[in-house]
């Protein structure tokens, strides 16, 4: 009988979002090693904080990595580091999530508790689909974007890279949300949203530009 070798996992970031990640890990397949965190020391959720930098991890190619930070632009920075260092990323998908077999998944993705992802959807690298989000058919979720809790994306929505869609928002079908934008919590999106803006409300209205790096 073949024995499955568990993937040794290091999570980048020891904040609140990482607690949800720990709760969704399949420990039959993953051996949680510890965290990397720029500021914290000691332990987090019972696991050691190993270092403040990937560069300080001994034999770093022996591990899989997951970005445990929800903010899209910070995720993007660590995603680029992992790519450039040729380090392996792992998907963490909660066992309660319902995902169509016709979904295309990248790497480094989080899909949280009670999420639904319907057919012909593409979720790009390092994206976050958070608790109870509903992603309908034909969606495209950009790299490092974060679809927050209880959000509904109706059919054929496209979300650009590094965009945050706040909790309990509803996005009408066939709309495009640009890159590097923020949709405020509880918003109702009835028209396309361009790149680099903050919008909020029901229906959404322009709040400000989002040009901060």
What is the predicted function of each stretch?
Residues 1-52, 57-58:
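Hydrophobic, well-ordered beta-alpha structural blocks that scaffold small-molecule cofactor pockets
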Residues 13, 65, 89, 136-137:
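Generic structural signal for conserved hydrophobic packing positions in ordered secondary structure
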Residues 22-24, 77-81, 123, 194-195, ...:
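Short amphipathic alpha-helical segments
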Residues 33, 63-64, 107, 161:
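Conserved acidic residues
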Residues 40-98:
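Phosphate-bearing ligand-interacting subdomains
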Residues 45-47, 102-103, 209-211:
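Short, well-ordered secondary-structure micro-motifs
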Residues 91-200, 204-207:
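Structural signal for interior beta-strand "rungs" in well-ordered beta-sheet cores
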């Amino acid at each position: 009988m073949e024995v499955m070798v568990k993937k040794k996992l290091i999570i980048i970031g020891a904040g609140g979002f990482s607690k949800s990640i720990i709760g969704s890990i399949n420990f039959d397949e993953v051996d949680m090693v510890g965290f990397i965190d720029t500021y914290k020391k000691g332990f987090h959720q019972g696991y050691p904080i190993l270092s403040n930098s990937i560069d300080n991890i001994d034999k770093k190619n022996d591990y899989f990595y997951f970005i445990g930070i929800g903010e899209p632009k910070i995720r993007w920075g660590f995603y680029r580091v992992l790519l450039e260092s040729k380090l392996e990323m792992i998907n963490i998908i909660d066992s309660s999530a319902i995902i169509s077999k016709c979904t295309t998944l990248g790497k480094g993705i989080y899909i949280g508790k009670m999420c639904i992802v319907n057919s012909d959807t593409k979720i790009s690298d390092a994206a976050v689909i958070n608790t109870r989000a509903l992603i309908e058919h034909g969606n495209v979720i950009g790299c490092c974007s974060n679809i927050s809790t209880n959000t509904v994306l109706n059919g054929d929505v496209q979300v650009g890279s590094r965009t945050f869609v706040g909790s309990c928002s509803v996005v009408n079908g066939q709309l495009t949300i640009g890159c590097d934008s923020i949709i405020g919590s509880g918003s109702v999106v009835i028209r396309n949203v361009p790149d680099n803006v903050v919008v909020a409300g029901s229906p959404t209205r322009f709040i400000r530009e989002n040009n901060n790096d």
